[in-house]
Amino acid sequence: MAYKHFVVVRDGETYGYKVIDAQITDASVYSLENLGADVNFVYFCGVDEAGHAYGILGDEYLSAIERVDAHLTRLHEVLLKRAHEHGEEWLLVMVTDHGHRDEGGHGGDSEQERASFVIAHGIGRDNPQWSLDIEPHHLTNLLLAERA
């Protein structure tokens, strides 16, 4: 499917991210199972929305994490199947774009608000051997090097 791109956009602000994140998962699973895409970029907003609205210490935030974990589990299962059935190598990367204040929101320059993480998990291949401290501007090059 070279030179073909598919973009799925759902309006979480209108319909809520519980619904939209699930629809994004369904579309991503379909893409992985049926379209054979080499790269999928999937964005779930439910955790970010819960952090803004309720802070990171409440039940709403934990529930949002559990929902996104279930979505990621579905994607992981599809990638495991592809690796097993087709001998494919996949790299599942999870990243946040920022942290939150305990009481909710972000936008400041505190260490807590600037905190982020990257998790890279090899499927049908080894995990990448990246440094524990990755500067945000280095991530693109690390990802591209994995395709070499």
Labelled PLM ranges:
Residues M1-A148:
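Feature captures the catalytic ectodomains and active-site-proximal regions of enzymes
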